């Protein structure tokens, strides 16, 4: 799913390039004569996409990350619940997770509805960039909550079957990954917002700042 969403962003960035190339051009400054603004915008989007692809590639090669470590923690948590038959504990924990995810999804959709009304002067591509990030964030948060709800019904039923217990573990891992993606798409909103507020140069700066922030946040937790 992450690859499909990244591909959609790259397509949107390419559309932005074509749209900018087809619009009437004003007299370019000396700096713009060397670096076209649309190229700067596409570079910012490509930088974010490249970072995500590289992180996924490192994880597949065995490197630890926050996302990978937390996914393993979900598996350990499921096994603890099955071993202790802590159904009430599991339901309470899942309820907290469902509440958090649904709150985030509704908040993101509210922000999206409010922001679209304030972007009357922006281009269609800029508005679409903001809306796509917000919708992707809300969707992944809501899907994470859906899987948690499904796991809550399945926990006691799957206790006596090893194959079903493994299926519950996979559901919890997928729920965690969707929650992680929800936050990641919400952070990505900073890139089109910077594009709207400060132009292509600001969007590139925001893209570089986001990758530095992600590089810090994606490190695996280390016991002190």
Where are each of the predicted segments found?
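N-terminal chloroplast transit peptides
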Residues: 4-21
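Membrane-interface amphipathic/juxtamembrane segments adjacent to transmembrane helices
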Residues: 54-93
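Alpha-helical transmembrane segments and their immediate juxtamembrane interface regions
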Residues: 122-149, 201-224
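N-terminal plastid-targeting presequences
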Residues: 26-39, 224
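Transmembrane alpha-helical segments and their cytosolic interface motifs
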Residues: 88-114, 177-203
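Membrane-lumen (extracellular) interface motif
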Residues: 34-37, 118-125, 196-202
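Hydrophobic alpha-helical membrane-embedded segments
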Residues: 37-66, 104-114, 127-149
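Juxtamembrane inter-helical linkers in multi-pass membrane proteins
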Residues: 64-80, 150-172
């Amino acid at each position: 799913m992450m690859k499909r969403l990244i591909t959609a962003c790259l397509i949107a960035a390419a559309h932005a390039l074509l749209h900018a190339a087809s619009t009437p051009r004003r007299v370019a400054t000396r700096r713009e004569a060397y670096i076209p603004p649309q190229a700067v915008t596409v570079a910012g989007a490509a930088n974010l996409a490249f970072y995500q692809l590289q992180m996924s590639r490192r994880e597949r090669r065995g490197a630890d990350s926050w996302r990978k470590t937390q996914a393993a923690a979900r598996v350990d948590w499921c096994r603890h619940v099955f071993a202790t038959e802590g159904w009430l504990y599991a339901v309470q924990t899942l309820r907290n997770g469902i509440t958090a995810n649904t709150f985030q999804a509704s908040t993101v959709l509210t922000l999206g509805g409010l922001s679209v009304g304030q972007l009357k002067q922006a281009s269609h591509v800029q508005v679409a960039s903001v809306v796509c990030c917000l919708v992707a964030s809300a969707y992944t948060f809501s899907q994470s909550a859906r899987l948690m709800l499904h796991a809550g019904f399945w926990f006691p039923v799957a206790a006596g079957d090893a194959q079903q217990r493994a299926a519950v573990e996979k559901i919890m891992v997928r729920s965690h990954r969707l929650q992680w993606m929800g936050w990641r798409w919400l952070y990505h909103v900073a890139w089109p917002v910077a594009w709207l507020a400060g132009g292509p140069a600001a969007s590139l700066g925001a893209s570089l700042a986001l990758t530095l922030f992600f590089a810090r946040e994606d490190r695996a937790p280390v016991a002190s």
